[in-house]
Structure formats: C-alpha cells, structure tokens
Amino acid sequence: MNLIIGLIIFVGLLAIWFISVGNRLNRYLVTIEESKRTVDIVLVKRYDTISEMLKVAKAYAKHEQDLFTDLVALRQGATIQESNQVITNQNDVLAQIRAVSENYPELLSSNQFLALQKEIADENEDLAAAKRIVNSNVSHINQEIVSFPASIVAGVKGIHQVPFLAEETQGKKDLSDLNYDLN
C-alpha cells in the first residue's frame, strides 16, 4: 500500500514538474513573440520612412524609375526568417536610394531628405535594440531546450530551437584594405 501511495506521489510530482517546465517554455515563446512585435513595429515605421525617402528622391530623379519600383511591400514578417528577409529588403532599397542620391547633390542637401536620413538612423538604432532583445529571449529558450531535463519536455511538446534575428553585416567592412600609413 505504501508503495502504491509512493508511486502515486512520484507520478504526481513528475506531472507537476512536466507541466511546470512546459509552462516555462511556453512563457519563453510568448516573450519572444512579444519582443518580435517590437521589431515589427520598427520595421513598419522604417518602411514608412523609406517610402517618404522614395517620394522625395522621385522628385529629384524622375528617370531612375526602376529603383522606385523595387520597394518591397513587406512591412513586417510573421516569422523570424521573414523578418530577416524584410530587413534585408529594406536595407537593399536604402542602399539603392543612397546610391541614387549621390548623383543628385541637391537631393542630399534637401532638408526633408536630411531629416528622413536622420529618422532612418534613429530607426536603425531602435531596430538594433529590438533585435538584441529578441535574440536575448531566443537565447534563453534555446538554452532551456538543449538542457536536460527540459529537453525532454521540449521534445514531447514539439518545441524546437528558435532561429536568431540576423545581425546586419551591411556596412561592415574588412579592415585589411585600409591604409595604416600615418606619413
């Protein structure tokens, strides 16, 4: 009889532990979704700013129409992979706008264009901060998922490692080609 009671208590404690770990993993997933929404908000704001930059640039560079049709309509991504693609697409359009603007000095000196460039810089900082938060949350759940015994619960619940938001490499250069001669 004591063995049966002991077994029931053990199974009950095991079930409570399993539910507790499962709930903790679910909370991590919710936290990741919440922090990813911040990234989506920044991407929408950034999209709107890029659209405004395109309007200003169109006024100066009417014959550069092919550039202006490349703005991808994606404003936010449902998954982390889609968000990475949206960020890449927006960065590509920004690079094209900057390339076109170099051909039009009057565009570069436009107060509206300069204000939009500053706004993009601010939004890039907001995006970087939001990405750090998402990646920190992703790191927490991924560490939990690969740690025993939580990995058992994650496996049973079908929870897999979550991908990180990609770090931007655009604008980062190899320093080996710099001239270090001080003379």
Task: List where the protein language model places each region.
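A helix-centric hydrophobic-segment signal that preferentially recognizes long
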Residues: 2-183
